[in-house]
């Protein structure tokens, strides 16, 4: 076999290896607690929803990187409140967010982003001005770097609840359950704390199914594991709603 044929064969084998997997990055926006993770998924595991279940889908994949970082400067001095009912008490401000701090974070991890095919960013509420600013900067960075070659998605947080906790929203009592004109039950909104607890529980359940002891170890030792669990569940919800065909 000539050198050219061997080279072509090696390139085809490498191409097949590349085509077998896909990398997805997930981001939970916050200026003090900014969580992200990157998961490696296998294309052979992506099926129609009628051929699999959510739990089976979540059991496939591998968390490559997960972390929680701070995007604001650390304040040097403790501030004393000068007015209001808490006058005289002290607090440590969260610091000031700057685009430079986010840009530095992104540039330091450029090799990670180069591997990714899809970026899933938590969509922010309109009243969260700081969160909107961060999400806009993040979206602009990826679209500037990769253009249309990679997908950047703003993902509403309620999708996580729809995918993983829909059964907990429905009032199952037939005597008190309310329905619309089509007979479909109304959903009861879960509280913020219950959503956080449920998300942590689901993320740990997913990692236990995968026997991912390294990521579980990181979560158990993190002070803000709820944000890190959010990015895991957000990524799974995206896969179910967008990658898996109906």
UniProtKB/Swiss-Prot annotation:
Origin: domain of life: Viruses
InterPro entries: RNaseH-like_sf, RNaseH_sf
SUPFAM superfamilies in alphabetical order: Ribonuclease H-like (SSF53098)
Sample GO molecular function, one term: nucleic acid binding
Family statement: Belongs to the IIV-6 170L family.
Protein name: Uncharacterized protein 170L
Organism encoding this protein: Invertebrate iridescent virus 6 (IIV-6)
Upper taxonomic lineage: Viruses, Varidnaviria, Bamfordvirae, Nucleocytoviricota, Megaviricetes
